[in-house]
């Protein structure tokens, strides 16, 4: 069962921890060595089956392994013997080396460079065995059998080991005879190259560039190249042996590694060997490969004695900003020999990310650190002297400057608020409260308010209130920060009672939105009034002046807001009723900061190119993010090679060098918080084979008025390379009325409106990229409205913008009452402005199922008749005119009806019977012939003239005739003379004179008759005589005197 070695206690440290291997235990190590050799002998004899593929290589004592970054070492459990460890390694294809340490089997995979690192344990109880597997020998890089061990930068000189006197100082528990006996036993199973060789390491100083030399052997005739195996992270498996001579100390291998310098001269004295510890920047090891250019003598070299120095860098230091300076001192327990000094080298091993600071005295005993940033720093000091070496470690912890807590500040918005019923809910925002760290708790409490069932108490940033009753409220907000500090403030809310006579403005409840939503609609249509509201007006409250916002519909019940930013906006709604009374209400819109979302990458639509076009642009500018996109990256993920991307780090990139095939380009976008998104676009490159396009319109269109819009679909047109332009044209024989919407005559689908009765013909011309074109035609037939003759229009005395849906319903209900039908039977077809102050409403009336439509002229006549009977204020709006939409007057078959004025235009020699128009139904007509009217008028005038002359003549004659006065006389029977008196002006003077001297005057009967004498009253006498006695006409002689009888008469 395998168990990988990660960060675990070092097995070898068990040997080093207590220095329990003292001189008194040497016999135990000798016995252990003997047991090990015996196990190896049994192992080689019992593995004949595995000998063909797995053979023992080199065996080394006092050497251990450590991993070079990854887990290349693993502990094999359940292997109580060396034989079982060897067999398990042979069976595992990944095992090339195993390390037998104190009964533990540690296997290793060192097939790759820099995967393993060797170090010296100086303990004979540590054995490193190399295995040669034929199938992996090349991968491991084993040398021929006559070569020396080379793995992991380890080299040795068997002759120098054999002749070196101080080897017992390194492994005092192993005698020379025992060592060579074990080697002879192992050589029985292996080749001459499998000699077990002790390790002799030579150190050489490195130059200032911190480069490491390689370890080489002096027993080979070849020079080895240095191959560096390094790793920034290693697992320390070290062992240290104590109990040797007092002047010899064995140190664990330092993390930088050991290096040797090859020498061509034989070392005569091991005590005079110079040992220097290199100081590389990164830890590294090297091992040698053979080079036939140089050779060295296989002579013995003395083993150097290295004195271990006890070095202390002091206790760990902990400082707190703003203090950022510290001083580290290195102390060596042993004093340097006379005339010599120690050298110091401080190295930074561990440091925080994004650290900074300054070091002073890196190669001195005292290291001064300054300008440190917060974090943990680990320093190592290396002290070296003549054949002496030591290391010390110290930690420096820099803590950030402690924060001085400031109490939070409670902020409410709005602080003073007033609402009126029927609005019974609102919100108060406390999220704008601030603190130097963080607010962890909000608490709302009602301090004062009307008597209700329960008081308000909530623990939210925004207080939402509902079911409020009239009165004054006071709410307290208490905020608590992360350090427990508190702060409070209050907010006042006034809820007014509803009044019935002025209007009640209601701007709706307060709203809360979260960015990126920056638009909202406020509704003031809940405002009420007992007689109706005539105007609405929205405005930004003075407390919110200066804030950026776009407002639309400020004079309508609905206010549309956009382009809002973070913060609180307060708006005021002012409503006015019919008599000019006004009311206001406020609403607060709280815009909270947004929550970041990943960007949305948009690489644009797929593209299709045709050679010779070999370049195009990739447009990712439509990519979006709720905050901001900070980087773009275009990459080719599929397609032929050879393309070039220009401006690949911008939203719009250019790709050139395209060939025939399909390319896939991927766009990656990132926002400010490093969230990213990807999108791909396909670019298809084709050979240049152009075919003309094919224009195709989907069928003819037939519509019936009042529907006056149509849609012509030319999207079925096709082309092999794609259509680049569409052009719709109207035939010259088509009606000129009708409009094209939104410039759709340059798009695949044509939208038409305001069409009139008739047949339209349209032509579609499509053009491709090469200029080839094709055309197609279609017709749009507009049929007349079948209900045209039954439509009734009424002109209302109201502006069209003031006619609301509610008022319209009330008016339709009144019309239904006049006509005796239901509201649902009146179908309003159109409402449009007639003049600036009037509105035209077009409707028709139908009965209950089967929905038979009433005749329009009958409905109009009935409505006119009912309106004459009713009072003037029966309708909510005054009806200026009621008529049919189409003029249906027959004009007495002597003219035609004007559809606009709804009056007859008579034919020549015909005119309107105005008597009938004024006295009867008022409909225009053409009943009278002009000729007959003239003749009749002439006759009437002549008749009137004659009649008038006759009357005048009669009047004059009657006035000019004098009254006849009766004169009586007594006539004799013989005298039959009669007398006629005619006192007229026509008789003249002579006639009068004749009358005076007539026989009547001189009748004797008058004088002589005494029988009949008539007497006149005095009054009558005077009148009669007065006219005769006044004067004498000119040219007349005085009459003779009358006789008494005449006087009496």
From Swiss-Prot:
Glycosylation sites: 247, 395, 472, 487, 525
Main subcellular location of this protein, as a coarse class: membrane
UniProt entry tagged with the keyword Cell membrane: yes
Localization per Swiss-Prot or TrEMBL: Cytoplasmic granule membrane; Golgi apparatus membrane; Golgi apparatus, trans-Golgi network membrane; Cell membrane
Organism name: Homo sapiens
Domain spans labelled MANSC: 49-127
Tissues and organs where the protein is expressed, per its UniProt entry: Expressed in cortical neurons in the brain cortex (at protein level).
Subunit structure and binding partners: Interacts with RTN4R. (Microbial infection) Interacts with AAV-2 VP1.
Residue intervals annotated with topology Extracellular: 51-932
Highest taxon in the source lineage: Eukaryota
Gene Ontology CC terms, in alphabetical order: cytoplasmic vesicle; Golgi apparatus; Golgi membrane; membrane; nucleolus; plasma membrane; trans-Golgi network
Protein name: Dyslexia-associated protein KIAA0319-like protein
Residues annotated as domain PKD: 312-401, 409-498, 504-594, 600-688, 694-785
